[in-house]
Every structure is written in C-alpha cells, then in structure tokens.
Amino acid sequence: MARTVHCALLKKDADGLDFAPYPGELGQRIFDNVSKEAWAQWLKHQTMLVNENRLNLADARARQYLARQMENYFFGAGAEQPAGYVPPTPT
C-alpha cells in the first residue's frame, strides 16, 4: 500500500515517495512532506536549472546551489527561474 503525505507544495494529500530522494535532514523532510507528483515536477525544474545555467554537477558549488533551490522550491518562496525564462503558453 502506498504512503500518503500531505504535500507541502501541492497542498493536498497524495502518494508519498518510496524512499528519501536526497541524503540528510533535507532528504528526510522531503520524504515526509513531498508527494511523488511534486517530486516529478521538481526533477523537471532541476533539469531546466542545470541546462539553462550550464551547471557542472561535479562542482560542489553547483550541488549546493541546487540543494538551496530544492529547499526553496518545496518549503520556501520557490526556486529561481533561469534568466530570460518565458513559461510556455497553454494550448
């Protein structure tokens, strides 16, 4: 049976993650408070941040930046958008 969490991002009850997706306290907080649906949305946003900002994930500063963005995305004011980002218009 799937775990249910009250998702901090989506503000509704939804299926929880199967395991902590990130190490440490932040990973546990995400596991306890973020749904699978919200995590999938973060992965898309994270991919955009990596690509648009040309982040090298071998660089510790890039990983720290992504960790800060992840915490802000789920529990803060929201993650940054890349410079010049224009959201797609619904069709």
Curated annotation (Swiss-Prot):
The keyword DNA damage does not apply. Signal peptide: none annotated. InterPro entries: Fe_traffick_prot_YggX (IPR007457), Fe_traffick_prot_YggX_sf (IPR036766). The keyword RNA-binding does not apply. Belongs to the Fe(2+)-trafficking protein family. PANTHER family: FE(2+)-TRAFFICKING PROTEIN-RELATED (PTHR36965:SF1). This is Probable Fe(2+)-trafficking protein.
